């Protein structure tokens, strides 16, 4: 991932980098990988996430 710094504006470049990293899901993955997650817990978490995504799509379609 690459972010260019213009006019020595490091703050803006850092903000852009953080935005790109969050959109790519890197922060979320790092949070998950901090500690070992049992397979059963992982399956449960993924199922909950899938339900949330599905509900979100349904809300958008009904609006």
UniProtKB/Swiss-Prot annotation:
GO terms for cellular component: ribonucleoprotein complex; ribosome. Keywords: Ribonucleoprotein, Ribosomal protein. Pfam families: Ribosomal_S21. GO terms for molecular function: structural constituent of ribosome. NCBIfam families: S21p. PANTHER family: MITOCHONDRIAL 28S RIBOSOMAL PROTEIN S21 (PTHR21109), SMALL RIBOSOMAL SUBUNIT PROTEIN BS21M (PTHR21109:SF0). This is Small ribosomal subunit protein bS21.
